[in-house]
A protein has these predicted regions:
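Intrinsically disordered, low-complexity segments enriched in charged and polar residues
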Residues: 39, 43, 66, 82, ...
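Short glycine-rich, low-complexity/disordered patches
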Residues: 43-77, 82, 130-143
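Intrinsically disordered or highly flexible coil/loop and linker segments, enriched in small
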Residues: 57-61, 90, 154-157
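Helical subdomain adjoining the active site within ATP-dependent kinase catalytic cores
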Residues: 122-168
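Conserved ATP-binding subdomain of kinase catalytic cores across diverse folds
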Residues: 1-65
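Catalytic activation segment of kinase domains across protein kinase-like and atypical kinase folds
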Residues: 67-133
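Intrinsic-disorder-associated interaction segments
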Residues: 18, 22, 34-37, 41, ...
């Protein structure tokens, strides 16, 4: 039967052979932040951008609008990418692999919205964990999100936080 909502939680039973060793992209980003390594952080943001670009596809003709798929979105990330944050991506030697795909957004996800959400989640864990970073210790989650958006390899559109908060 079709899902009752645009967002569904799918039950997963991963095989232990599917687990990857090594740090998540988030762990690597936090290490770069602690080291005040902005160049290294920008490299990780570039790796994330490359992953997003590689997984972006044309919007399905039957995809219905939802908070993370606004009208006018021509390209999408697949539905399992709704939670594709730095905490859910692990390098596998040649690429980044999404290791937590239990959430599904029907019709896909706007790539910019998914990216802003991922950057907000990284800012949140940075601030909430007290991780040192190159900016003032009083930097808020919102401020750090905007800093990360500014370091991202390409513009993410106007008012990224307002769009994210409206979607959430």
């Amino acid at each position: 039967p079709p899902p009752a909502s645009w967002l569904t939680l799918r039950e997963r039973h991963p095989n232990v052979d599917d687990y990857l060793t090594g740090p998540t992209l988030e762990q690597s980003a936090l290490a770069r932040l602690r080291a005040h390594d902005e160049d290294g952080l920008q490299q990780l943001l570039g790796d994330f951008h490359t992953w997003v670009t590689a997984h972006t596809v044309p919007r399905p003709s039957d995809a219905q609008q939802h908070p993370f798929l606004p009208v006018g979105t021509d390209e999408v990330l697949p539905g399992e990418c709704i939670d594709a944050g730095f905490d859910n991506l692990v390098p596998d030697g040649t690429d980044l692999r999404l290791v937590d795909d239990e959430w599904w957004a029907e019709g896909g996800v706007d790539p910019d919205m998914a990216t802003v959400r991922a950057l907000w989640k990284l800012a949140w864990v940075t601030v909430e964990s007290g991780t040192r970073h190159p900016w003032p210790a009083t930097t808020s989650i919102s401020q750090l999100t905007l800093i990360l958006c500014g370091l991202y390899p390409r513009p993410l559109g106007p008012n990224p936080l307002e769009r994210l908060y409206a979607a959430e």
